Amino acid sequence: MGAAISQGALIAIVCNGLVGFLLLLLWVILCWACHSRSADVDSLSESSPNSSPGPCPEKAPPPQKPSHEGSYLLQP
């Protein structure tokens, strides 16, 4: 019985493994959710650029401005 592991050590090893596995699973789910959300926003912006930005305002396209608006400042 030289390889006997105490019950407390066995419980600690199992719990640490479960916590690590759950953290890894949570990280994968978050990455998948963010990736699929950004892909949905990209497909929406390609199909209809005038549509509402949707659930991700940080990915919204910038408002369209006339290109000659800033040229007045450059001319003397």
From Swiss-Prot:
<feature type="region of interest" description="Disordered">
    <location>
        <begin position="41"/>
        <end position="76"/>
    </location>
</feature>
<dbReference type="GO" id="GO:0005179">
    <property type="term" value="F:hormone activity"/>
</dbReference>
<dbReference type="InterPro" id="IPR034461">
    <property type="entry name" value="Adropin"/>
</dbReference>
<protein>
    <recommendedName>
        <fullName>Adropin</fullName>
    </recommendedName>
</protein>
<feature type="compositionally biased region" description="Pro residues">
    <location>
        <begin position="52"/>
        <end position="65"/>
    </location>
</feature>
<dbReference type="GO" id="GO:0045747">
    <property type="term" value="P:positive regulation of Notch signaling pathway"/>
</dbReference>
<keyword id="KW-0964">Secreted</keyword>
<comment type="function">
    <text>Involved in the regulation of glucose homeostasis and lipid metabolism.</text>
</comment>
<feature type="signal peptide">
    <location>
        <begin position="1"/>
        <end position="33"/>
    </location>
</feature>
<dbReference type="GO" id="GO:0005576">
    <property type="term" value="C:extracellular region"/>
</dbReference>
<keyword id="KW-0732">Signal</keyword>
<dbReference type="GO" id="GO:0005886">
    <property type="term" value="C:plasma membrane"/>
</dbReference>
